[in-house]
Amino acid sequence: EFECEFLGSVDTLISVSKLKTLVYNDPIKRNAGLDIYENPKEDHNYIITVDTARGIDGDYSAFIVFDITNFPYRVVAKYKNNEIKPMLFPSIIHDIAKAYNYAYTLIEVNDIGDQVASILFFDLEYENVLMCAMRGRAGQIVGSGFSGKKSQLGVRMTSAVKKLGCSNLKTLLEDDKLMTVDYDIIAELTTFVQRKNTFMAEEGCHDDLAMCLVIFALSLIHLLPFRPPPL
């Protein structure tokens, strides 16, 4: 465990006082962008949230694996790669999701993520891809197995949806309901700031992992009441 004082910028989503308390550990396994902190455990419940990039050396395609069996929820693995092509990314998600007890996956589908979600669900036949049902002014409801035309694979990140996710993420982290010891995640949180009436990375920084956290916070709003208890 390494104590490193992460000093947040001005207007970070997470308070500077909280950021100062975060410490990081080395992963137990590291391979081609995948860092593992805890191996899969029998009877544990996991969810994976995914943020996809185009794979041309700009932003990173990223996902985070969360253990949601008990409070506090924990980051148990993360993947971050700025060269992986969108056509290949679903296979990596598929392998890790299966390993973590067929984890539910929630994919942000504003851009190329739509293709990733489709390949994972239709081509790789992975059934635990979460969907969103459109509910008019209520926005998007996250869940599985919706029927009807107004449902889609993954979550579409509108400004209202992102605002809700950011608010919930702030509560989770500052109330110690979500724990992470990943250096890259903590580093991104220190530069995830308010800009143009939303939260995003500071100029020259990345927020791919931070957005995976936001997607996770969104999923909890809808999913947890329906989550089956551990066997």
PLM feature segments, named:
Residues 1-134, 144, 159, 163, ...:
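RNase H-like, metal-dependent nuclease domains and their acidic two-metal-ion catalytic environment used
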Residues 137-138:
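Surface-exposed loop and turn segments in beta-propeller and other repeat-based domains
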Residues 143-153:
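Surface-exposed intrinsically disordered loops and tails
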Residues 153-159:
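Amphipathic alpha-helical blocks and their helix-capping loop/short-beta junctions
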